[in-house]
Design a protein with these regions (language model features):
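Surface-exposed ligand/attachment interfaces on beta-rich extracellular proteins
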Residues: 8-28, 49-50, 81-91, 109
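Short, surface-exposed beta-strand/strand-loop-strand elements in extracellular ectodomains
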Residues: 37-55
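Short proline/glycine-enriched turn/loop motifs at strand-loop junctions of beta-rich domains
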Residues: 29, 35-42, 91-97
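Short, intrinsically disordered N-terminal pre-domain segments
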Residues: 1-21, 147, 173-181
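Small/polar beta-strand repeat architecture
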Residues: 68-98, 103-175, 179-181
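Intrinsically disordered, low-complexity Pro/Gly/Ser/Thr-rich segments with frequent PxxP/GP/PP motifs
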Residues: 10-12, 51-70
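Asparagine-centered strand-capping/turn motif at beta-strand->loop junctions
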Residues: 33-38, 162-166
Length: 181
């Protein structure tokens, strides 16, 4: 199989008997490739993973390709407050559910990373709104600048967690897989 890198790869250290977790990343591909170096690890991928010895095993020097679920949409509005309301274009749906974690990018003032979706409102015509909206657990009350961005988008956000059988490093990279190499 041939792998085509998507975005930037990253790494983090892990130790024996403890779950270590990466920083958040926006899901841009349907696969993440994981390599364990220096020690074996059990690996979990998700919004708030905490790997245990019951998760996917990657031997020292071994690799694994694990599935991700991509989801994204354009952003046409942001309402600031102690929680933040993100509005997507009319005629589209919010591709996230309650409990998912998302990242908003492409806006000068309203960007945030890895915040939890608290609710999704898809009702039509309420208070003159026909767009789908979601409430996010992000305090944007300090932002007084109006939202104005033609390039803002919201994407699913995940982390990688590793529970080591010894000490080592996890390298991870989102990839596209194409045929046989």
């Amino acid at each position: 199989m041939a792998h085509r890198p998507v975005g930037a790869g990253s790494s983090f250290n892990f130790t024996a008997g403890t779950a270590s977790t990466s920083s958040a990343f926006s899901v841009q591909s349907s696969v993440v490739r994981v390599v364990a170096v220096g020690g074996a690890a059990f690996v979990a991928v998700g919004a708030t993973p905490s790997a245990t010895n019951a998760d996917y095993y990657v031997p020292s020097g071994g690799t694994a390709t694990l599935a991700l679920t991509k989801a994204s949409n354009r952003v046409v509005g942001v309402t600031t407050g102690t929680t933040t309301i993100v509005t997507v274009p009319e005629g589209t749906q919010v591709p996230f559910g309650v409990g998912d974690y998302i990242t908003l990018s492409g806006s000068t003032y309203h960007n945030f990373t890895h915040q939890q979706v608290l609710s999704v409102d898809t009702s039509a015509g309420i208070a003159g709104f026909f767009e789908s909206r979601m409430t996010v657990n992000y305090n944007s009350s300090g932002i007084v600048t109006s939202f104005s961005s033609a390039n803002a988008s919201v994407t699913a956000s995940n982390k990688v967690s590793a529970y080591g059988t010894g000490a080592g490093v996890i390298y991870y990279q989102q990839v596209q897989i194409s045929g046989d190499a």
